[in-house]
Amino acid sequence: MPTIRPDEISTIIKQQIEQYNQEMQISNVGTVLQVGDGIARIYGLEKVMASELLEFEDGTVGIALNLEEDNVGAVLIGSGRNIQEGSIVKATGRIASIPVGEALLGRVVDPLCNPIDGKGPIHCTETRLIESPAPGIVDRRSVYEPLQTGITAIDALIPIGRGQRELIIGDRQTGKTTLAVDTILNQKGQDVICIYVAIGQKQSNIAQVVNILSERGAMDYSIVVAAGADSPAPLQWLAPYCGATIAEYFMYQGKHTLVVYDDLSKQAVAYRQMSLLLRRPPGREAYPGDVFYLHSRLLERAAKLNSRLGEGSMTALPIVETQANDVSAYIPTNVISITDGQIFLESDLFNAGIRPAINVGISVSRVGSAAQTKAMKKVAGSIKVELAQYRDLEAFAQFASDLDEATQKQLARGQRLQEILKQPQYSPLSLDQQVAIIYAGTRGYLDDIPVEKVSSFKQGLLSYLGTAHPKYGEIVLSTKQLTDEAEEILKTAIAEFKQSFLAKAA
């Protein structure tokens, strides 16, 4: 029979009394009235705040979106399969936040920054709110530094600056994602941190982008935030804000960041789905009334900070998909009005073999020209006018049988300019290479080269410049200008190469 030791019992009781804490925990709780389709209606939670995180009995997290008189409408982040009518819900008193830090570089994460690449946990010491206010007017400065995309047509005609928001818009399968990925690849060695946000994409497409970035060594300075087509609507809605939050962390440390949102049409569709299930009144195209605010509060977070805040920047490249080239639909017009310009890709140009399929006529950059390098400004000044004139003449030439010599020359020049702006995917060019190609095109060096041989001439000239005249590239890349010395070297190189090229062709 065990012996009872009173001294031990009294010691334990004393310890329990000493450790007793009178502090009461008051929780704001409610009960689930209805659940389904990723939406829960909850009774109670009288003191809940808009966008507050809610915790369900099974551990599922929700966000309170509709605060009504007798119930709260919440979206579920997760499957919510184990939530039943009558389940207890607790308000957490917190707003959605994610861990941020250098440890995210090279990783693929979901919109809550949980790793999904199988490379183990991510250890971040800091957290940031997913929804945070954009920098104010006094915190910004105007865009003045170029963000080189490596795509000649963009850097010459529609230049982008650090801190700008440039929309990439076009039908499906016109090369929108390719443009964005090329831009990320071109940031290698430029000290720019890139965030690629995939919203509602097929898993195979996301895997393809990650593979390309890994193969080219771009994942060292990139982060991929993925909310695939099979992700719940709330995660597709949150994904762009997660990308912006990660970029903000680096921006406020004085670093340069680039965020690609691929694509905001699918985010708007996910938000429409949530809003209709929450019984919010539908507006144009069944989108809710605040769909403009959905995108404006996201894109306004892109900025070029002033010197007091460290001169960091966040450049945004939102992508929007159109139906049958209709840029006057609701979401495209909204995003066009928010951004600082757009790059319009056309399926007709793409099918005609002009890739990147940029329609130079309606593509604009409202602030990027201030950030264009002097070297590019010097050579690209006339190319836009010449291309516009070529398009007009091309339409006219279809109906006219006999054209005067000047018109024929202009058409021939335009064809060659169009040819030099063609570029294969995943092969961005450096500034000195772009300047050399445009210089050769606008100064008439290609006028007597057959159109079908312009592409091989271009490739040959670039390799010849790199091997025979490396000083040209050194001058342009170090000064960002086409100095008199560099121009003389370039003229000599083009003349030498052209002579050998024509001799071989003959």
Swiss-Prot record:
Its main location: membrane. It is found in: Cellular thylakoid membrane. Its EC number is 7.1.2.2. Keywords: ATP synthesis, ATP-binding, CF(1), Hydrogen ion transport, Ion transport, Membrane, Nucleotide-binding, Thylakoid, Translocase, Transport. The record marks 363 as: Required for activity. GO terms for molecular function: ADP binding; ATP binding; proton-transporting ATP synthase activity, rotational mechanism. GO terms for cellular component: plasma membrane-derived thylakoid membrane; proton-transporting ATP synthase complex. ATP binds at residues 170-177. InterPro entries: ATP_synth_asu-like_sf, ATP_synth_asu_C, ATP_synth_asu_C_sf, ATP_synth_F1_a_nt-bd_dom, ATP_synth_F1_asu, ATPase_a/bsu_AS, ATPase_F1/V1/A1_a/bsu_N, ATPase_F1/V1/A1_a/bsu_N_sf. It is a peripheral membrane protein. Transmembrane segments: none annotated. Pfam families: ATP-synt_ab, ATP-synt_ab_C, ATP-synt_ab_N. Produces ATP from ADP in the presence of a proton gradient across the membrane. The alpha chain is a regulatory subunit. F-type ATPases have 2 components, CF(1) - the catalytic core - and CF(0) - the membrane proton channel. CF(1) has five subunits: alpha(3), beta(3), gamma(1), delta(1), epsilon(1). CF(0) has four main subunits: a(1), b(1), b'(1) and c(9-12). NCBIfam families: atpA, PRK13343.1. This is ATP synthase subunit alpha. The lineage of its organism: Bacteria, Bacillati, Cyanobacteriota, Cyanophyceae, Synechococcales.
